[in-house]
């Protein structure tokens, strides 16, 4: 196993909540891996406030140019940057509309949080990223969704191939940050899940394209949320139920003895 694969394998096994800290630690030891790790490892999203509109937005590689980040609300960089990368007028118009649509989706499904949509031009069409962050008031729990998509033209008129890669970074804690440091005081669950999908959909105008992207994100989030609930949390619940009993051990021992006796009789 080479150093790149070893670093990625290590990060997959560590707590997703601490992935930024762990990534910095690895890069301090192996700085030559910076390009590979920073481009392939999704980190929890950070929040900034647009100085012009007052709206919050999320920071990521998709709105970064150097050390500056572009606000999807004002289309300006912070710190200010001359000749920063911006999209064409049509793609920028789509970006504004998608930000408004995802904000409505955020209020309906998450009852608050921060969302950002960033679009950029490609040769024949465009691509983008839909970002969603929902954290508890104490920041002891959080949900980060990162949806990266591209819209590719086909041989059919007004029909496009949409390819979506979605990542969810989830961490939950049953106690405060002080309690989380003590294993006996809190239960901590963390997960990192990535899925891909593609669909061929008609899009005769901008409104249809916005609806298509919204549909893809909504369906993918629902599918991933159900998977986490049924498989990840379901398996965790089974493990806890097997290792924890609400009745005293002394009360359970007679039942265990009786069960073993029955099993022994059945095996004869």
UniProtKB/Swiss-Prot annotation:
Pfam families: F_actin_cap_B (PF01115)
Record keywords: Actin capping, Actin-binding, Cytoplasm, Cytoskeleton, Nucleus
GO cellular component: actin body; actin cortical patch; cell division site; cytosol; F-actin capping protein complex; mating projection tip; medial cortex; nucleus
Compartmental location: Cytoplasm, Cytoskeleton, Actin patch; Cytoplasm, Cytoskeleton; Nucleus
Gene Ontology biological-process annotations: actin cortical patch organization; barbed-end actin filament capping; cell morphogenesis; mating projection actin fusion focus assembly; mitotic actomyosin contractile ring assembly; mitotic actomyosin contractile ring contraction
An MF annotation (GO) of this entry: actin filament binding
InterPro entries: CapZ_alpha/beta, CapZ_alpha/beta_2, CAPZB, CAPZB_N, F-actin_capping_bsu_CS
Top-level taxon of the source organism: Eukaryota
PROSITE patterns: F_ACTIN_CAPPING_BETA
Main localization category: cytoplasm
Family of this protein: Belongs to the F-actin-capping protein beta subunit family.
Assembly behavior: Component of the F-actin capping complex, composed of a heterodimer of an alpha and a beta subunit.
Function comment: F-actin-capping proteins bind in a Ca(2+)-independent manner to the fast growing ends of actin filaments (barbed end) thereby blocking the exchange of subunits at these ends. Unlike other capping proteins (such as gelsolin and severin), these proteins do not sever actin filaments. Competes with formin cdc12 for attachment to the actin filaments barbed ends. Slowly replaces cdc12 on the barbed ends in preparation for filament disassembly during contractile ring constriction.
Protein name: F-actin-capping protein subunit beta
Organism: Schizosaccharomyces pombe (strain 972 / ATCC 24843)
Name of the gene this protein is made from: acp2
